[in-house]
Amino acid sequence: MPKISIRGTEMPASPIRKLAPLAEAAKQRGIQVFHLNIGQPDLPTPEVAFQAIRNIDRKILEYSPSQGYRSYREKLVGYYEKYHISLTADDIIVTSGGSEAVLFAFMACLNPGDEIIVPEPAYANYMAFAISAGAKIRTIATTIEEGFSLPKVEKFEELINERTRAILICNPNNPTGYLYTRREMNQIRDLVKKYDLFLFSDEVYREFIYTGSPYISACHLEGIEQNVVLIDSVSKRYSECGIRIGALITKNQEIREAVMKFCQARLSPPLIGQIAAEASLDADADYLRDTYDEYVERRKCLIDGLNRIPGVYSPIPMGAFYTVAKLPVDDSDKFCAWCLAEFDYERQTVFMAPASGFYTTPGAGRNEVRIAYVLKKEDLTRALTVLERALEAYPGRTE
């Protein structure tokens, strides 16, 4: 029998989804599972999106242009202008989710063997996309003790060599919820200029910043306009993960032309998804305001609750809707699997993402988990109770 490819063997399993079979088995046993593992918002999608879908009046559901509909891209120009990001419709390429934007950015900008510097912990799929592109992730450590702030510039420069081609950031950050400061963004800008690197900036959580600190986009950084590739998606801000609409944005025409070759090879981004996403830009201002307020309350509920559990510590996330928490366990992979396979409290259990999957450094994140606060406060409160009982019962507890 033929063997699968080396690429297929090296592709990492998702730390967010790899325990899903255990969760499904628990449900089959009648256990209620609180899903804290995945960034799937439970808040309603804007009604205008559903109205647009219901009002589709077409005889054919045709291919859309490979770059995405111009009407949608022109409307996005106005959206970004609200964040002081000046674009034209030609700067925007509509993609099948933010994930495709990351993959196409890698494919267009990196050669096999090229290296990308990424602060860790990092969104696990970045590693998968790098493998797909034949590139290599080089991680720079951030720690829970330091609130996941960036290390000094010298630590970055220790990693830079002749194969280094890019720095990748997620701001606000998934999985940590960290928000980069102006000083940190300027530090990254200076490195990009000094070593002539690409800067890939995943900014899908810009609506969710809780500190009062300003949102600093990579597109705000002067002097590196041709180096920046911005990644975006409607999945989180409008609870539209399933329509698979994202965007790759750059002022670099050479990058856009290369990306368009990959876009043409995959033919077109989703037609119906673009219709829904374009309509969502007309959602009432109260929609995003109410969504923001809800996440502020959920964040407080979760972080206060976690830090009341003996042996548990979580920093206060400044953005997105995740936190990385340290638990008093020997191994978070084992603990998360145990919660689903061997534990329940009053017929309930919790599904969390082991943080080790967000690191490439061996042993890092071994006693950490990522938790998404995408459940209503009543469910979060109950999930915290279940987690506390699980930690009390877990055989591998360390404190």
Give the label of every model feature segment.
Residues K59:
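Basic nucleic-acid-binding alpha-helical/helix-turn surface characteristic of O6-alkylguanine DNA
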Residues P2-I4, G8-S14, L19-I56, S86-E399:
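PLP-dependent class I/II
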